[in-house]
Every structure is written in C-alpha cells, then in structure tokens.
Amino acid sequence: MSKQDVIELEGVVKEALPNAMFIVTLENGHEVLGHISGKLRMNFIRILPGDKVTVELSPYDLSRGRITWRKK
C-alpha cells in the first residue's frame, strides 16, 4: 500500500489495551483499534488515555489504524 492510499485522521485515545493497542475516538465520532507505529515504539513514546493522536487508516479496513503521531 502506498503512502497516497492512507487516510489520516485526528483522534483522542479513549482506552489503552495490552500489546500497545489503543481504542481511539476519531473526530467524526467513529472508534477504531489502533497500534503504535515503529518509530513511536522504538523511541519509547508513551501514549496515555486522553492524548490527541494522528491515526492512519487503510481504505480496505476502516476499523483498524496505525498511530503515527502524538500531539503535545
């Protein structure tokens, strides 16, 4: 999948799950299951409930996404 195919949305982390998975509520009200991208995992970026994040969604499965950025 190329970088052009992804859908980037903003959201707020609602709940932290095991194995670095999170339930994220998007701006449009939908909830998706998100996992941390490699760079966030490598640099030990902590994501807690209530954090604003950027999520990349695949057009093939809109219920799962990758957390690529944590807002300040």
Curated annotation (Swiss-Prot):
Localization terms from the record: Cytoplasm
Superkingdom of the organism of origin: Bacteria
GO CC annotation: cytosol
Pfam families listed in its UniProt record: eIF-1a
S1-like domain segment(s): 1-72
Main location: cytoplasm
Keyword rRNA-binding among UniProt keywords: yes
Single Gene Ontology MF annotation: rRNA binding
Keywords, ordered alphabetically: Cytoplasm, Initiation factor, Protein biosynthesis, RNA-binding, rRNA-binding
Stored SMART domains: S1
PROSITE patterns documented for this protein: S1_IF1_TYPE (PS50832)
Gene3D superfamilies with a match to the protein in the record: Nucleic acid-binding proteins (2.40.50.140)
Keyword rRNA-binding: yes
InterPro entries: NA-bd_OB-fold, RNA-binding_domain_S1_IF1, S1_domain, TIF_IF1
Stored HAMAP family: IF_1 (MF_00075)
Family of this protein: Belongs to the IF-1 family.
Function, as annotated: One of the essential components for the initiation of protein synthesis. Stabilizes the binding of IF-2 and IF-3 on the 30S subunit to which N-formylmethionyl-tRNA(fMet) subsequently binds. Helps modulate mRNA selection, yielding the 30S pre-initiation complex (PIC). Upon addition of the 50S ribosomal subunit IF-1, IF-2 and IF-3 are released leaving the mature 70S translation initiation complex.
NCBIfam families in UniProt: infA
Description of how the protein assembles with itself and partners: Component of the 30S ribosomal translation pre-initiation complex which assembles on the 30S ribosome in the order IF-2 and IF-3, IF-1 and N-formylmethionyl-tRNA(fMet); mRNA recruitment can occur at any time during PIC assembly.
Protein name, as recorded: Translation initiation factor IF-1
Gene designation: infA
